Structures are given as C-alpha cells and as structure tokens.
Amino acid sequence: MAKEKIIGIDLGTTNSVVSVIEGGQPIILENPEGQRTTPSVVAFKNSDIIVGGAAKRQAVTNPNVVQSIKSKMGTTSKVNLEGKDYSPEQISAEILRYMKNYAEAKLGQKVTKAVITVPAYFNDAQRKATKDAGTIAGLQVERIINEPTAAALAYGLDKQDKEETILVYDLGGGTFDVSILAIGGGSFDVIATSGNNKLGGDNFDEEIIKWLLGKIKAEYNIDLSKEKMALQRLKDEAEKAKINLSSQLEVEINLPFIAMNESGPISFATTLTRSEFNKITKHLVDLTIQPVKDALSAAKKTPSEINEVLLVGGSTRIPAVQELVKSLLNKEPNRSINPDEVVAMGAAVQGGVLAGEVTDILLLDVTPLSLGIETMGGVMTKLIERNTTIPAKRTQIFSTATDNQPAVDINVLQGERAMAADNKSLGQFQLTGIQPAPRGIPQIEVTFEIDANGIVSVSAKDKNTNEEKTITISNSGNLSEAEVERMIKEAQENAANDEAKKKNIELKNKAENYINIIETSLLQAGDKISAEQKEQSQKMIDEIKELVKNENYEALEQKMAELEQAMAAAAEFANKHNDSDSNNNSSEQNN
C-alpha cells in the first residue's frame, strides 16, 4: 500500500493551487479542466455546488457566486446563497474539498492530510478559520504555514547549507505582502513583514476597465459602468490584456456587440500598449514601495544586505513591477519558479518533511501563548512572548519580596492576561536555601527554555549560593485550539482592566519598596539627618501605608511623587553632611 501523501495547498484570494512531493521534489496537480491553478470561486445553483473556472464563468449570470472569500476569513460575516447563510470557513471548505478530490483522482489514493498556507499577517482567528475550513473539507491540517516561508522552502531545496537573508515580494490577485526571512542550516525564520491587503492584480484589471469605459464613452457616448453583463466582459478582456502585456508590447481588445444604441449593436475594438498600461497603473506599482522600505527598516537591513529577492504571485509577471523591484533592491529578482505555483510547492515541501519524504529542513514552530511566572502582587511576568519561534531560551533576574526570605515559590504560567490568577498554571516548584538578606538583595536567576518539541524547562538559581531547582513541563501545548483562542480573546477583551490592575499592583510594590528603603535609610542615617526631615519622612511613610492599605491608588501616585522628592532632599542633605565630616576630619589630620 502506498504511503499516504500530505498535500500542500495555497488557498489564495483569487486562485488556489495544490502540490505534492514526488521523487523528493514538489509537483503541481492539475484540476479536472487541465489547469494548474483553480479560481477561488464558489457558485451555488439549484443546490449544486460548483467550484473553480466553471463557477467564475457564472459570476454575472448567477447571483449566488462568491469570490475572494479569503478576505473574510476569521470574521463573523455570513454569505447568503439561495436563502441560506454560510460562513467564510464553509465557502473556503468547498474550494479545499474540490482540490482534495482532484488530488485523490490524480494520485490514485486517498488524501486526508494537508499543509495550508496563509499570509504572514494573518492573525490567530484567521489562521484558525483556515484550519477549520480544512477540517470541514475532510482534511487533517498538519500545519498552517506563512506564504513567504513556503516560497522560501520551495526555492531553498537546493541550497540548504547557505546562510542568507531573503526578501519575498508577493503581489497576488487581491493582496500584497513583503517578507524578509533569515535562512540558514535548513531553517527558515520570518524576521519582518509588511504589505497592503487591498492591493493586487484585481486593481490592475480595474484600471484597464476604467480606461476601456472611458474609450467607449468618448467614442459612442455610452456609459457601461452600471451594465453587469458588459462589465463582466470588460473584466475578462482586461485580465487577458494584462496577462498578454507581460510578454507583448501591445494587445488588441475586441468587444463585439458590447452595447446597443439607436443605430443597433455596437462592436468596440482598440489597442492597449504596454506603455499606456504602465501609465494607468503606475500609482499601483508605486504603492508597493513603502511596504518594502518598512520591511527593510523592521528587519534592520539595507538593500545590499538582501542576498536574494523572490517574486511570488501572478501579478509579479508585470514588467513594470519587476523593474521596480530591481531598482529598489539593486538586484535581479529570482523568477526561476512559476510565481503562481511557488507557495503551493513550498507547502508540499513542508508536507514532505512531515511525511518523512524530505529531510534536512528544520521546521520552525511558535509558542501559541506567552510563558512566564507569578511575581509580587500576583502579576504575570512574561519571559517568552506568544508567537516566539522555538527552540527558545530566555533568562531574567528576580529577587525576594520580604527581608530574610528563605525560599521563593516559582509558579509557571501560560497565557496573555496581566494577572497570574487569570492564566493557566503549568506547574510550581520551590527554590530553598536562600541566605538571610534584606528584600531585593538576593539575585534569583529564572530561565525558561523550550526545545524543538515544545517541551518547557524552567529553572531558578540563587546566584549567591548556586542552589538550583528545575521543573520540566511537557504539556504546555496540550491546550485545545478552542482554549488557546478563548485565552487570547479574553486577554484582548480584558486588556484595559488587566493593565489597570497591573499598574496599581506595580505602584503598590514600588511604594512598599520605597518605604523599606526610606525606613532603612532613616535608621542608618541616625543624627546625620535633621529631626524635622525625619518627622516629615515618617509622616509621609505613614500616609502612604494608609493609602496602600485602603487601595487609594490615585492619591498614592501623588504621594509617591512627594516621597521621591523627600528621598532626593534627604540624600542631598546626607551627602553635604558627609562632605562636611570629611573636610573636618581632613583639617584635624593636618593640624
């Protein structure tokens, strides 16, 4: 029995593609119409569901046609088709099911597993919606990966040992994304992203349509901008013209019987040159400049530090786009893989790795939720942020909360809330043997480490005694997707309230710390500080203690500012007194 394949799917806004590993290399699977790309269009007709080119051809005549559903993924919006509401996940599932079915027909075996790509900017809700669409389609989604990572995987098959910085310029049908990746030793890491989710090939088509409408109106004084049938024909011709102008300097556009006037049917014909096309779409090409600059800035890279530029998306075939990329980055972009297919091929590579068909590529994963510990006042202090690429290691120094504290309790937390109690506790342990010392003096080094399998190790070490305690947690990833999503959503909904709580606790901790410092300083200062200043400081300390006790944080903040002024004055007085004593001692020694 043949080993089960894991297919790679580029679920695009305009078109979708499916690929699989054969003989260690990714190949594209053609759909039943013999096409390597499938329009991401779904039509409902008399309860029949039609996907792809056949659905696209009904866009004008059939009101129950859905296009560009990807832009709605992760939202609560619904699409009403033939009197019934459908979620974006359900519509996307029809596209995925269609691709799953024809992949099975091509491969001659059952397909139940897939890797699906998403834009790098997709949030958790959008990623989860994509995975849910796969589940509805009968697919076990093994991994959701970023489109630029997939593109780099496809290009990186033959250069796994090189360390490079790669810029992926992805201009698709409906969105534009630019990503910068660090590649080396078979690992791929996205270090910066930018883009415009309302810019793509469709916008170029619209400019040609506007140009054609203007030509027709000028010649025949007819406005076709509200005529659906005519607009669909114009859209089809505009798309063809755009594609042909990538390889030709001019194209003929023929629209027989496009309209009627008092003289009868009107047939329209014109020529669109590449020069004119560049002129009417220049503003669209220019809109890609700033995202490229933003990505370079975020990655802290200059164009000269980019080793390679990859073009992704059918719209990168436009010569003006290629010229812009070349001038922006001072290098010829790599166009060796079909830009419409490269993302699906990369997804197939990742599927091949998971299926054991491709080796020597490190799969990077990320932490779904932040990890940290409970600190004074019940605050969650994060050491590893959500979406950190693993393996990862972070270390931070903490201290004791009370004088002569003999031990510290480490409560390991997972979640996004500001308060420890609102997050999930993964485990607890105690570090003992801390030598007696005033609060804040002992140095406790806490280290979080996550290996490639997602196993978390947390250690606490007393830097004075080298006493160390470690806990290993293997269930940090055992939350269901629903739980992860719920925790993220709760954090977003409670962000303002949580931040206010955290701020108040930090203010309280700061107040108690200052009180401790002042009381210790007053004790040590003895007669070096005036009785009046002692009385003033003690009065303020008592007032602050009362405010802390009553949780009057607004007044506490004001008093803290006064306390800091008093501390500064006390320090200045003590320094002057010390200088005076020093001078007196010096004079006595000289006599």
Curated annotation (Swiss-Prot):
Transmembrane helix: present as a keyword of the record? no
Q: Which CDD domains match?
A: ASKHA_NBD_HSP70_DnaK-like (cd10234)
| Keyword Hydrolase recorded | no
Region of interest: Disordered: 570-591
The family database entries (Pfam families) matched by this protein are listed as: HSP70
GO MF terms here are: ATP binding; ATP-dependent protein folding chaperone; unfolded protein binding
Q: Which family does it belong to?
A: Belongs to the heat shock protein 70 family.
Q: What does this protein do?
A: Acts as a chaperone.
Q: This protein is called what?
A: Chaperone protein DnaK
Q: What upregulates it?
A: By stress conditions e.g. heat shock.
Gene of origin? dnaK
Q: Where is the composition biased (Low complexity)?
A: 581-591
- Which key words tag this protein in UniProt? ATP-binding, Chaperone, Nucleotide-binding, Phosphoprotein, Stress response
